Amino acid sequence: MDLILLEEKDAADWVYRGEGAANIVLAYAGSAPHLIQVLVSREFLEEIERNIKSHRPDWRIDAAKVDTLNESALLISDHSLFPHGIFKGNACISVEIKPKCGFLPFSKHIARQNAIKRSTTRFKMHQVLKFRQQKIPNLSEYDPLDLFSGSKERIHEALKALCNNPQNNFRVFLNGSLILGGFGGVADNSTTTAEALEDVFKYVIEADDGLRMTSFLELLTETVYKSGVLDRLLDVQKLDNYDVEGAIHAYYNFISQPCSVCRQLGEDKVSPISTFLHALPPNESLEIVKKFLIAATAKDCSLMFCFRRREDGGSDSPYDRVYLESTNQVFDYKVHFIDLDLKPLEKMEYYYELDQKIVSAYTEALQNGPGTENNHTVKLYESIQ
């Protein structure tokens, strides 16, 4: 197909949707035909940066600027909507979930002092570090093990916890517009409250006032349970069978550099199992690291669930259906994985250092216990017991 160059005048057709560590996501609000690949001018990107600045979280602006030297932009489907917009006038509600790691690590490479990792989820421990860094105002009660459990009751509890404290793990859209959750940062505040969704959901869920939120969670629970999509995600996450504490040695072995982890421990304290990893052929070391990075992507990706009411008697829809018993409604739904960028090899050291910080913060919070003069520590201790 022909490439289209976007100029400064075209920037007004693009609106801020969110961002991650490496990419900013914009929604196209213009009327041009379907676009797949576009060239962009420096002036277009400069104008985009000005247009979206007021919508970006402050900490994102400080962390990264738009690269105005890029010559092209990646266009992807907006999975918060069904294709061709709103079908037959029905409202579309979408839910983005970042489920995080759904299992407890079982690797024999986990150090004795970090054994807490085998009994406490990474998400729960990371909450403590984020709280200490003042990136979140309170600790989430969400447990990824509940969401991945295969139990409808536990899935419901997990989704309720996410809805009550979305952070950057839960977002709700109505017709493509964000109505619950932040714009993509751990410090974001929700744009609304769960209670305020009651009024919004009247366009989608035929329940009495005060019951729409309950019905919404029932719909989402049924869909997560029925789709089985988390089982597939968990299989990929479990490609990490060495944990970062093992994979880091394979990484240094592959790049043929002295291992900083072993150097910090001292030669007399390096375990035989770590020595074994440093003796592997490069291709085997690379395989360990590749699987770790693929699993890391699966642990950090998001799922987008999109719903619209199916018309009475409608049977020609190409989408799967889910029945909401409490309102006797049938919904079309579709599920997509998003944020599947493969993690770069160069981030291995960062992953190891972050892992150690997370475990250290959680262990210290447990050890300090109640009675300390630090109010934050007291609050942490009470929350994690």
Residue ranges and their predicted role:
Residues 2-385:
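Polybasic, positively charged surfaces/segments
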